[in-house]
Amino acid sequence: MSRKLFGTDGVRGRANTHPMTAEMALRLGAAAGRYFRRSGEDHHRVVIGKDTRLSGYMLENALTAGLTSTGMNVLLLGPVPTPAVGYLTRSMRADVGIMISASHNPAHDNGIKFFGPDGFKLSDEAEARIEAIVAGEIIPAQPQNIGRAKRIDDGRGRYVEYAKTTFPSGQRLEGLKVVVDCANGAAYRAAPDVLWELGAEVIPLGVSPNGHNINDGLGSTHPEACARAVLEHGADMGISLDGDADRVMIVDEKGQVADGDQIMALLAARWAAQGRLRGGALVATVMSNLGLERFLQGRGLRLERTAVGDRYVVERMRGAGFNLGGEQSGHIVMTDYATTGDGLIASLQFLAALSDSGQRASELVAQFEPVPQLLKNVRYAVGADPLSKDSVQAEIARAEARLNGSGRVLIRKSGTEPLIRVMAEAEDETVLREVVEDIVAAVEKAA
């Protein structure tokens, strides 16, 4: 069963443009209601969270209309991080959770992603079935069975309390000055609250959302803002979250940025030493640096690679019983604590290491020397397929032959935008640059 609406992380697009319209959100809500309703006529429960985009109000109301029309009761959480929706779906015994967010994308985009009753994102098959219902006739509930909607005032507070329980109970953050950049997004209140309540001196950044400024020069895709604040305030470290707080970058006291690979390396080594790393493996995507793989091998650990997307990381982790995984982009998945990437809880794990190690953040973040990596994006026309062109495949083959096992080449389509991502790694930076530029030129010509 194919999927056209759903990408690698739910349904996403420009607000008020297909598929991110009120009409489509209403149909998605109704289709999800039909898909998740158990047998019988009893009402069922849905939790809906959102980030701080202006279009979130429109999509929230449309989804609510669709869901209640099929007999689902809707609990509205307001602005909360994506991982909070996963957690609250499970803790509130909901049949489905929905997050309205386009994550790290600009404010003019938005998205809708679904969580099952276990708090995990839906499988490809489940999304395809919902999509099939969207395309057909959706039978509404009888008038007496229409659902209700209710705002939940303490949804954020429940998540804050849960997040604190993931930090070692015998430790406090007193004496640590921490910058936290919330990207004017979903964690703009939750993240500073958690850090302050654990004892840190908190320097908040990106905590004034206005509906239009989410991810605007801030957050995990712009960690330089957090780095400047760390240096300006003489902070011990910085935390740079994205718009829905499922990604994080760490900034050390020198203003140096550690990506998801470095964070995962630290946690894997630390957990392995503590006997907590299940299966002796870390799950990451094909985008993770070759240096991470070599770092793990040097410690008798394995790197299990998946397709790009934290959902695929989670699927591998659940299928094989691993408890640590993530992406270079900053999704850190710890299934002992969360059902999806959780930037705040990952930060707390880093802070726990910082607190009990007696080291500075700069000593913790540089776990391995990355192999030089270069990534470039090439936009292509909708409907075009540059990767199918013989000229592009020939250029990729030439690049692989030139690297001759000393590096790697990865070319893929983005799952959320009409982009071809051209990535390569090589010890020789001149060769690396030439290889990527040659492939980019071939893709641009075919696009």
UniProtKB/Swiss-Prot annotation:
Cofactor(s) required, per the database record: Mg(2+)
Lineage: Bacteria, Pseudomonadati, Pseudomonadota, Alphaproteobacteria, Rhodobacterales
CDD domains: GlmM (cd05802)
Domain of life (superkingdom): Bacteria
Function noted in UniProt: Catalyzes the conversion of glucosamine-6-phosphate to glucosamine-1-phosphate.
An MF annotation (GO) of this entry: phosphomannomutase activity
Residues reported in the UniProt entry to bind Mg(2+): 103, 242, 244, 246
Gene encoding the protein: glmM
GO cellular component: cytosol
Enzyme class: isomerase
Protein name in the entry: Phosphoglucosamine mutase
Post-translational modification: Activated by phosphorylation.
Gene3D superfamilies in UniProt: Alpha-D-Glucose-1,6-Bisphosphate, subunit A, domain 3 (3.40.120.10), Alpha-D-phosphohexomutase, C-terminal domain (3.30.310.50)
Classification via HAMAP family: GlmM_B
NCBIfam families: glmM, PRK10887.1
Catalytic machinery residues: 103 (phosphoserine intermediate)
Cofactor stoichiometry and binding remark: Binds 1 Mg(2+) ion per subunit.
